[in-house]
């Protein structure tokens, strides 16, 4: 139990996909202007990551490995992720039109988010069990959400601040991201697995 706690904590704070592995930067920079947008893209991405990790674990161990089709892994993963995103979009459109309107613009973008493909692949390459794969996906998604919300709240304050002309736009965004990354590097000595 203790090792699972450290495993989850490590994936959220120390091995954060945005700040350490530099995955998922497109929605991080593009959809973090407001906290509402950050929560929307984070929720949708987290849901797709967890569901696709579960599906892809089963596909890998019950179809690709037994039939020696490992060379098709990335193509199959991309197809399943695309199918999952479309399925979620159809379900949301029919069951919750309000949630669909909030997340509607973000759902197609999730398919191209590299973190959605990377999390199941890293889980596979790290030889995680089924439970560890689920915990890895949930904790990585929570880390993604945490950083998105922190950054979007800081970014909202930056928009209200008087930023020098040379730093307006992308420069201040990149400086802020680098400072947040340095803060998260401080957690490096917190957990040793």
Swiss-Prot record:
Its main location: membrane. Disulfide bonds: none annotated. GO terms for cellular component: plasma membrane. It is found in: Cell inner membrane. Its EC number is 7.-.-.-. GO terms for biological process: electron transport chain. Keywords: Cell inner membrane, Cell membrane, Electron transport, Membrane, Translocase, Transmembrane, Transmembrane helix, Transport. The chain crosses the membrane at residues 5-25, 47-67, 72-92, 102-122, 134-154, 171-191. InterPro entries: Ion_transpt_RnfA/RsxA (IPR011293), NqrDE/RnfAE (IPR003667), NqrDE/RnfAE_oxidrdctase (IPR050133). Belongs to the NqrDE/RnfAE family. PANTHER family: INTEGRAL MEMBRANE PROTEIN OF SOXR-REDUCING COMPLEX, ION-TRANSLOCATING OXIDOREDUCTASE COMPLEX SUBUNIT A. Part of a membrane-bound complex that couples electron transfer with translocation of ions across the membrane. This is Ion-translocating oxidoreductase complex subunit A. The lineage of its organism: Bacteria, Pseudomonadati, Pseudomonadota, Gammaproteobacteria, Enterobacterales.
């Amino acid at each position: 139990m203790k090792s699972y706690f450290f495993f989850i904590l490590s994936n959220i704070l120390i091995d954060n996909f945005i700040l350490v592995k530099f995955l998922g930067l497109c929605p991080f920079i593009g959809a973090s202007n407001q906290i509402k947008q950050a929560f929307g893209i984070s929720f949708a991405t987290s849901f797709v990551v967890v569901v696709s990790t579960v599906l892809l674990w089963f596909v890998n161990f019950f179809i690709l490995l037994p039939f020696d089709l490992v060379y098709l892994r990335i193509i199959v993963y991309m197809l399943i992720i695309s199918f999952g995103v479309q399925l979620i979009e159809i379900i949301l459109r029919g069951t919750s039109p309000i949630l669909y309107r909030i997340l509607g613009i973000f759902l197609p973008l999730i398919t191209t988010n590299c973190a959605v493909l990377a999390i199941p692949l890293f889980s596979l390459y790290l030889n995680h069990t089924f439970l560890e794969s689920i915990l890895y996906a949930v904790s990585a998604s929570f880390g993604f959400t945490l950083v998105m919300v922190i950054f979007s709240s800081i970014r909202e304050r930056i928009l209200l601040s008087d930023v020098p002309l040379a730093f307006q736009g992308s420069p201040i965004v990149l400086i802020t991201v680098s400072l947040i990354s340095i803060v998260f590097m401080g957690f490096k000595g917190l957990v040793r697995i």
